[in-house]
Amino acid sequence: MESIEKKEIRPLFIKERIAVYVYCYSYKGTRQLSKFGDVVYTSQKSNYSLLYVNNENLSDLLSKLKDLKFVKKVRVGHIKELDQNFSEAFAQTNLAVKEEIERL
């Protein structure tokens, strides 16, 4: 019981994470990528891996990844830059469909 009470309880904060695509020369080195972040997907055929890493140390991590022998290129995902509010696009599509129906 005492060991449970001594453990520190960490708060459940969600950290900003970003997708990083790592293109490799061969499939062999992809196992080493788990040191840098969470490997979500690895393609044997296309020789790339998808990592999720913390946004805080992104620049340091990118330079470390580029320095690895088996890495061809590193790309950062752009999902944060995109507008994820689709209500406007949905309204425009509805208007276009209604106009098409009225023409018929």
UniProtKB/Swiss-Prot annotation:
InterPro entries: DUF2129 (IPR016979). It comes from the Bacteria. One of its GO terms (cellular component) is cytoplasm. Keywords: Cytoplasm. It is found in: Cytoplasm. Its main location: cytoplasm. Pfam families: DUF2129. Belongs to the UPF0298 family. This is UPF0298 protein YdgE. It comes from Lactococcus lactis subsp. lactis (strain IL1403). The gene is ydgE.
